[in-house]
Amino acid sequence: MAEEYVDVVDIEARKKALAVFREKFKEILEQVMRGENPTIMLPKRTLSNTIYDEKRKLLLLGPEKLKRSFFDLHESKKFMQTLLMARIIYEALERNEYPTIRDLYYRGKHTIVYREPGGRRHEENTWDEQRESDAVIRDIEVFTGLLREEMLILSKEKGKVVGNMRIRSGGDIIDLSKMGHGAYAIEPTPDLIEFIDVDAEYVLVVEKDAVFQQLHRIGFWKKHRAILITSAGQPDRATRRFVRRLNEELGLPVYILTDADPYGWYIYSVFKIGSITLSYESERLATPNARFIGVSMTDIFGYKSKKPYLTEQERRNFIIKAKEADIKRAYELKNYKWFQTKKWQIEIDIFLEKKAKLEIEAMTSKGLRFLADKYLPEKIETGDWIE
């Protein structure tokens, strides 16, 4: 009879999370034992309390705190929601479970029935919608300093990866170079992945899954010794963390390929400096030295001595007219501190002048080999990227 596999990485992750929970929530118990009003102090997760650290190139939470007390009528429900969710997560860690955020919503969802001193009956739901329980999970993240992935909470897999690399996950050694026409789905707990060995010079992250599949099928990653990843649109947390680890632990440069429009550029910035709405995650999820490889406006139209990759006829054929929402988004990006470098201001100004955008697929319309064997390698070799 085969011995039962013991996942040491999983065990250590649970031990760490349980220890943090005990330490942080012990403070509340001690307040109760002293006869004090039990209170949780949380960093405020608001736009006004989000700052850009120019030195570290990261979006971070600022110094403002939120006081959540049991005896505050305006905060008591949120206080109890926080303790309820913390208990559910703690029990799941103890039981070696892997709950999803949807599981946590249902595990805590119930109705509390109570009566006023005069006898009037009341009902109060712990929470009504998942967005409420999700917000509580985020509060627990900032309170404990643990990402939900470190609490072994699962979410839907989104990102995919292929390349000349072997990893260990759940006791299995997985060769990412032997995925056939498919790819390895980046698991929602990327810190449980062990990197065994890698033979690659850089990481290429492609916004679009369809372009990722095309590059994969023609063997781009083999020929150019790359780890090829897709975020399939806006990146999920697991993909961002996986990319960060490849850069931080293995020293691989990271290049991001998106559509030439403000939404693609923002996807790049989420990988690089973090998300505005989830800035508390940036220190572990963002990759500050990620490089934007394209598609850039100067690739389309040229700039000074730089020649465009598209002819005038190709521009007429492939360019898409920008919508009002695109233009509005471009002005927003232009005002963000992290887009106020000279190169980014040039890109955004060209976009606003031309009111034109381009999808990555326009480059493949010149031939897939053009994208794979000329455009991408040439831009990497010549350092034609934006940081």
Curated annotation (Swiss-Prot):
It comes from Hyperthermus butylicus (strain DSM 5456 / JCM 9403 / PLM1-5). HAMAP family: Top6A. NCBIfam families: PRK04342.1-5. It comes from the Archaea. This is Type 2 DNA topoisomerase 6 subunit A. It catalyses: ATP-dependent breakage, passage and rejoining of double-stranded DNA. GO terms for molecular function: ATP binding; DNA binding; DNA topoisomerase type II (double strand cut, ATP-hydrolyzing) activity; magnesium ion binding. Signal peptide: none annotated.
